[in-house]
Amino acid sequence: MDELALSFSLTCLLPENRASLSPSQPLSFQCLKAPATLTWEDEKQQRWGQPHGPVSSPLLGDHRCLVPFRDLNPSSEVNTANLLESPSSLLLTSCYICSYFSFYILGEKRCHSLKRLRYSVCCKVCPNFCACGKENVSGTGQVCTGVHVGAKEQEEPGGTQALRSCGIYCLEERTDKASHEECRERSTLGRPQCTGLTPSLAGESPCPRLLPGSPTVRHLIASSCPGLSDPLPLPPGTLPLGS
């Protein structure tokens, strides 16, 4: 934990009534309103304990979510055909999911440091994460500070629905053309923006990047869901840190 901090923050997926849930029940979640994309100044304020105020985001709204988000199967595509297999799968109605596999590198660790994590799930759901973890990009001057994994309902031929939306956060150590182009190539969403802390999403307002344990997380939950003051913990055994 001195090199990497792992945050599995279900900051917009909170059970409505944890006490009454049984293991066999689908969990009912309420999506929170997310703050706008955080700027560098916002992040400095977070470090000093000044929370960013919550504002409305079109990515969230007041949709209802059914999301026991624990064990995504890395061997299968994410779609409605295989999401309904078990309560531990990702069950989804017509709403956006703002769960996070967020890996924060402390200091100046580069992308290839992420190979210490078991990230096959993230790779399957978000190919950008795999690209970030490859050692052949370790010398490009890129530091991957987080990976956003979301899901969106999308119509496909035959009535099936693909549910995948990915974005990668890159913090440029250098601004030379080679490193910037390589960062652009790692994005598969059409509008890569790999400078600063801007997520590369396809023209949609993203969920925020929240620092692990930051006041912002607690502030969002406390202001949006009275009585739930803490983010949900990382499920035991899920995506452990390597040695």
Curated annotation (Swiss-Prot):
Glycans are attached at residue 136. It is found in: Secreted. GO terms for cellular component: extracellular region. It comes from the Eukaryota. Its main location: secreted. Residues 1-19 form the signal peptide. Keywords: Glycoprotein, Secreted, Signal. This is Uncharacterized protein CD300LD-AS1. It comes from Homo sapiens (Human).
